[in-house]
Amino acid sequence: MPDIAERYEGYLMDLDGVLWAGQRVFSDAVRVVNSLHSLGKRIVFLTNNSTKSRAQYVEKLRKIGVDWVREQDVVNSGFATAKLLREQRGPLKVYPFGDVGLYVELMLQGHRLVNEDWCWVGDVDAVVVGMDPGVTYWKIGAAANAIRAGADFVATNPDRTFPTERGLMPGAGTMVAALEAASGKKPDLIVGKPYKPIFEIALSVLGIEKSKVLVVGDRLDTDVIGARNVGLDSALVLTGVATLKEVEASQVKPGYILRSLNELLV
């Protein structure tokens, strides 16, 4: 395979399934990312995972050896959602259905976080949904009631699963599906991959023309389709969710199929 790295100046690089799976770090992938950086390539880490804030991702990346990363080098779906809502509608009263990282990003953008009591009296502007490891029956009920009462139903991302060292676990898309069933409504807005909003934010941060940008990820349904939706090339890494069998059966094909991130530099 030709040296792919020579063809691109900018990379939108996924994290889960590319640099790590849960607590298991892919050390060779870390080496590749650092090599790309040393070659002068621009990298923005683009992840649908909203459980951590951008600052928390910087901390994790530095801990595994990506010492050069800054907060502006990370775009996750929690940040993108909070930013987009503020820009489009101003600060909102938000019921956050997710983990601490989502709460942080919403507050940093000036949104007011409200609790379940507000959902039952219909005084919520938006229910923002990410992956929530503490989801309960009553939390689903409160969020669904707010949505039925007129709150915007906003999904940070549609990922039904995400890779861990133990295998696939339920993702934000699973939470979204539960709220669709409970509220009888579809999301008013989905921000994360494969949808355009998160790519547009990431591209503005990257600052490189599209023809010189490569999307690198482990999912056909978000990374590859998302890249196609915004006119970007894509590389699918087989260290996460997608399998070669799934790629062969899919009508949507990535530009490159990599057994590991190492092949970017081969």
Please state what every model-predicted region is:
Residues M1-L15, W20-L39, K52-V75, A82-V266:
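Asp-based, Mg2+/Mn2+-dependent phosphohydrolase catalytic module
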Residues N49:
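Conserved phosphate/oxyanion-binding catalytic-loop motifs
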